[in-house]
Amino acid sequence: MKIFFSVGEPSGDLHGGNLIRKILQRNPDIDIVGYGGPRMASAGCQLHEDLTRLAVMGIVQVLVHLLSFWKLVSRADRYFRHHRPDAVVLIDYPGFNWWIARRAKAHRIPVFYYGTPQIWAWAPWRVKKMRKLVDHVLCKLPFEEKWFRDRNCNATFVGHPYFDQLQNESLDNAFIEEIKNKNGPLIAILPGSRTQEVKHNLKWFLKAARIVRDEVPTVRFVVASFKSSHADWAQNLIEQSDLPVETFVGRTPELIAASQCTMACSGSVSLELLYHQKPTVILYWVPKWFYALIKSFAPLLQFRVKYMTLVNMLADEPFAKRLRLLDSDWNEWGEIPFPEFVTSGDKSPQIACHLIRWLKHPEERERCRKQLHSIRAEVAHGGASDLAANYILEILEGNPPPPPTPHFLDSQSVAVIPEMALTK
């Protein structure tokens, strides 16, 4: 048996590596090949290309690398034609993976989407594409299963793979104690894992840090960098700010554990912050032109999610009855766990306001921690990789579905997985 993986994000590489290990534990004779990153390679995947090096954001960056993406899609198509795998597993990275799914369906290869793109948030009309191109949707979030099933997609909730990693993670406790034992409260700054995110977010976080420092002179700051190039860029910015900020590479879990509170880029890191129950302010910054575009077309885009942050979605009803307003300020204490700002402007004063309150009023920090503890008890369970691996192999080995439906047939023609298979 052979399974082809297509993964483009660093976080997807992590989850793909864990899933591959579980698949090979159950059946060591399976060949795992495809596109991914170093963690998938170390788990036993024969990489055709390190796709994580092309993890880009924004239309401009996509256009710059368009030829590279097209060559990789064509290469996958040739592989499907000459070495037909038994299944294709996609993780995140929708812009590229839709094309991989289309090629797989053209060759009648079953497609599994593990860690589906959040189309329910930003592009609900794309569920038609999901229905045509994907045979099995493995959902990370509890409300996703119902959302996809209501739209005639084969979907089952397996849990979020991020919690698998967090439960198995071993922290450097000596490093944590060393950081914590220095004088003054500690705020961790998490600007993101992509270069564009770091460049967009860090300047606003440092501006907020300056405001916090003026109110709480003993406060210290640490920046968690995903890679050395990010740390070098951050260090240049920090030197200009004249703030007490240290930068570390590959120490995100320890820095989160050691901090009193954090400011972070919107993304899956919010689940790690939930796991460690850290009060956090979330920034989702977008360029002005993109902000104007989204705001202008919001009615057409049916942009009805109430929040941008996963933890806030898990804490409340994720979908709004009316359109979500961009740039809204969540200043009501206790309304949501993580105050969030979706903006193209400067929200550093608002970000600082929350951090100052948490530092000056421990009871507010404790109230937020209790709220996070309650959410964690409900959703932060491991086992997603196990469930996903078992589901995929049961379908391929023990409960094979009918031949995959060509992508050009309508939703009424798509075969539904037997209920027994969905509940296993």
State what each model feature region is.
Residues 1-424:
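Nucleotide-activated sugar donor-binding and catalytic core shared by glycosyltransferases
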